Curated annotation (Swiss-Prot):
ATP-binding recorded as keyword: yes
Entry GO MF terms: ATP binding; ATP hydrolysis activity; DNA binding; DNA clamp loader activity
Family note: Belongs to the activator 1 small subunits family. RfcS subfamily.
InterPro entries: AAA+_ATPase (IPR003593), ATPase_AAA_core (IPR003959), DNA_pol3_clamp-load_cplx_C (IPR008921), DNA_Rep/Repair_Clamp_Loader (IPR050238), P-loop_NTPase (IPR027417), Rep_factor-C_ssu_arc (IPR023748), Rep_factorC_C (IPR013748), RFC_lid (IPR047854)
Gene: rfcS
Subunit structure: Heteromultimer composed of small subunits (RfcS) and large subunits (RfcL).
Residue sites binding ATP per the record: G44, P45, P46, G47, T48, G49, K50, T51
Lineage: Archaea, Thermoproteota, Thermoprotei, Thermoproteales, Thermoproteaceae
Classification via SMART domains: AAA (SM00382)
Summary of the function given for this chain in its UniProt record: Part of the RFC clamp loader complex which loads the PCNA sliding clamp onto DNA.
Keywords for the protein's UniProt record, in alphabetical order: ATP-binding, DNA replication, Nucleotide-binding
A Pfam family recorded for this sequence: AAA
GO biological process, any: DNA repair
Name of the protein this chain belongs to: Replication factor C small subunit
Annotated GO CC locations: DNA replication factor C complex
Amino acid sequence: MSELFWFEKYRPRSFEEVVDLEEVKARLREFVKAGNLPHLLFYGPPGTGKTTMALVLARELYGEYWRENTLELNASDERGIGVIRERVKEFARTAPVGKAPFKLVILDEADNMTSDAQQALRRIMEIYAQNTRFILLANYVSRIIDPIISRCAVFRFSPMPRHLMAERLREIARSEGVELKDDAIDLIYEISEGDMRKAINLLQVAAAVSKVVDANAVASAAAAVRPSDVLELFNLAMGGDLAKARDKLRELMYIKGVAGVDLIRVFQRELIRMQLDDDVKAEVAELLSEVDYRLTQGADEEIQLMYFLMKLGSIGKKIRVAPKKR
């Protein structure tokens, strides 16, 4: 197996290789065709293709000289706006290589910068606008100040649809000589929530153990809980069998290594699909929110989850003894 991270190994190198994001690709192609582009702001959840698209754009603009004409920075890694200013100044002082009229600065995690730092960034963008274009990458556009947004063409990136993720994972598995089961794809999608980088990394970790990757291999690789385990835990508690529910909880937490907060997340996701009356769902959802909050405040995971299971037992008992509707 190659030591290279599969996410990097299979990163698209051209617009044609990028799956999904058709509207984004169409607009960026127009910029490339015109030989010019404004400052850009790409925003959306992690793993939705922001960095990949920025690098593809650089390749399309500069061809073989894309590395010489592109500067990648991470706002979280740099030691303040002063360092970013100096690096951009040093980069922008030399002429672009080739025929391009400008160089490209890709700034990741721009939304992690303070408002003051973003104001300074805005001034940097203005100073070097003659021969430098910026692509800002952010998870949350709401954390970017308006003066920067108004100077950029803004593009929204969404999580990859399940069918496209499945298709891509199968392609990678075939290339690596891995047999990928359908239940593995289902679980990878559930865990990754459309984050393609996370999905490919999960596949690689699972494939490192076995060339046949099923849901069990994925769950083990991710230290993740399967929806079926959560449903079993839920049914045991709702049925009043708290002893077995406790044993199942401890198995998940201490043998399979599942974090309590991850259990709550899967409970929240699966609750929507459960065949329960709306008032029961609302009561369970409120209970999940209460436990989730306590966990974020540092409360003991096992105690809080046992409290949750006991409350489920009480809810189940009320349902069982409630008079039948005529």
